[in-house]
């Protein structure tokens, strides 16, 4: 059975007297840094020039370049976008790591796929909250927390596991519970969830439903409401109580349709395709494609983004959200 670590079984001892450099001050960076600081940890911020630099200063942190922050720190937590971590690490972190330091991440992508290859004399661990940074911070301030995963890739000092747990406690995660994993497991399951279900799977399911109704002659506005807008109602129910809560809350007509028509849409071949997606993640095909496209200026990525931006469902959605000022402010400006 999975073991969960809580506040009462984890101490801050492994990080006593150590300085932590949080590299990045975006969604996760600001939450980690502020929570650690509020828990009494010694924190500095490492950033490149930009808006985040001033924001971190306004929040009361000592802010340095990435290399300067690394030189001061015992623990370096890298909270930058996946695609820039490798370059920043090689130029501004790696030259300044010392024996016995700890290198940390909130996602295992660059370590697992060897984009970043740390020296053998430093600890390498991850602490990955299962929620966005604003929620990590808000729940901490409210006295609760977002659960997290932790894992150790390299234990040079014999203390990497304790340091990782102390770090998890520092951001508040042990209030809710922390589950041990590996870089491999965290990375592959995270990518699979994004590609097959949460982002890729759901977006194509919604688009296909929209296209089916519009091609059958139904008004695009009604199609949007039925397959996209109402998705939030169902997801919220699922989030709060699982699929059982959805089926308890919807009409008998909807529940019966769930049972008889769901398997007609998500057929066994869909699961087989999911297995192929997982295989491409496991064998490194996806990571290589992503890394190579990044090196080429993200030509494929930006073209795919532009193609999706032009889909009819996006235009219809922009127009309909004008009727709903309570959500209009969440629209993304291009």
Swiss-Prot record:
- Reaction catalysed by this enzyme: (2R)-2,3-dihydroxy-3-methylbutanoate + NADP(+) = (2S)-2-acetolactate + NADPH + H(+); (2R,3R)-2,3-dihydroxy-3-methylpentanoate + NADP(+) = (S)-2-ethyl-2-hydroxy-3-oxobutanoate + NADPH + H(+)
Q: Does the keyword Oxidoreductase apply?
A: yes
Residues holding substrate:
251
Q: Which cofactor does it need?
A: Mg(2+)
Cleavable signal peptide: none
All residue ranges annotated as the KARI C-terminal knotted domain in the record: 182-327
EC number in record: 1.1.1.86
The pathway is: Amino-acid biosynthesis; L-isoleucine biosynthesis; L-isoleucine from 2-oxobutanoate: step 2/4; Amino-acid biosynthesis; L-valine biosynthesis; L-valine from pyruvate: step 2/4
Role summary? Involved in the biosynthesis of branched-chain amino acids (BCAA). Catalyzes an alkyl-migration followed by a ketol-acid reduction of (S)-2-acetolactate (S2AL) to yield (R)-2,3-dihydroxy-isovalerate. In the isomerase reaction, S2AL is rearranged via a Mg-dependent methyl migration to produce 3-hydroxy-3-methyl-2-ketobutyrate (HMKB). In the reductase reaction, this 2-ketoacid undergoes a metal-dependent reduction by NADPH to yield (R)-2,3-dihydroxy-isovalerate.
Protein name per the record: Ketol-acid reductoisomerase (NADP(+))
Q: Which organism is it from?
A: Staphylococcus epidermidis (strain ATCC 35984 / DSM 28319 / BCRC 17069 / CCUG 31568 / BM 3577 / RP62A)
């Amino acid at each position: 059975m999975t073991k969960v670590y809580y506040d009462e079984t984890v101490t801050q001892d492994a990080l006593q007297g150590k300085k932590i450099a949080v590299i990045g001050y975006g969604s996760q960076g600001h939450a980690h840094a502020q929570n650690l600081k509020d828990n009494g940890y010694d924190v500095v911020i490492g950033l490149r020039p930009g808006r985040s630099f001033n924001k971190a200063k306004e929040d009361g942190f000592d802010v340095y370049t990435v290399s300067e922050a690394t030189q001061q720190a015992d623990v370096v937590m890298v909270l930058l976008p996946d695609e820039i971590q490798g370059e920043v690490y090689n130029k501004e972190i790696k030259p300044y790591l010392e024996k016995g330091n700890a290198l940390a991440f909130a996602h295992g992508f660059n370590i697992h796929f060897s984009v970043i290859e740390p020296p053998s004399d430093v600890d390498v661990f991850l602490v990955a909250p299962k929620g966005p940074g604003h929620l990590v911070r808000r729940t901490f301030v409210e006295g609760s927390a977002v659960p997290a995963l932790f894992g150790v890739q390299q234990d040079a000092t014999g203390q990497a596991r304790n340091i990782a747990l102390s770090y998890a406690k520092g951001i508040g995660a042990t209030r809710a519970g922390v589950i041990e994993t590996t870089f491999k497991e965290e990375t592959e399951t995270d990518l699979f969830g994004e590609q097959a279900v949460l982002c890729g799977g759901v977006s194509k399911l919604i688009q296909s439903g929209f296209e089916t109704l519009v091609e059958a002659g139904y008004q695009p506005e009604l199609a949007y409401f039925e397959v996209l807008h109402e998705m939030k109602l169902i997801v919220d129910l699922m989030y709060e109580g699982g699929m059982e809560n959805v089926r308890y809350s919807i009409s008998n007509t909807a529940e019966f349709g769930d049972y008889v028509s769901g398997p007609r849409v998500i057929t066994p071949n869909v699961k087989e395709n999911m297995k192929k997606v997982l295989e491409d993640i496991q064998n490194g095909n996806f990571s290589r494609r992503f890394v190579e496209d990044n090196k080429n200026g993200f030509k494929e990525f930006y073209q795919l983004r532009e193609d999706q931006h032009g889909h009819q469902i996006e235009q219809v959605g922009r127009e309909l959200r004008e009727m709903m000022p309570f959500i209009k402010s969440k629209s993304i400006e291009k």
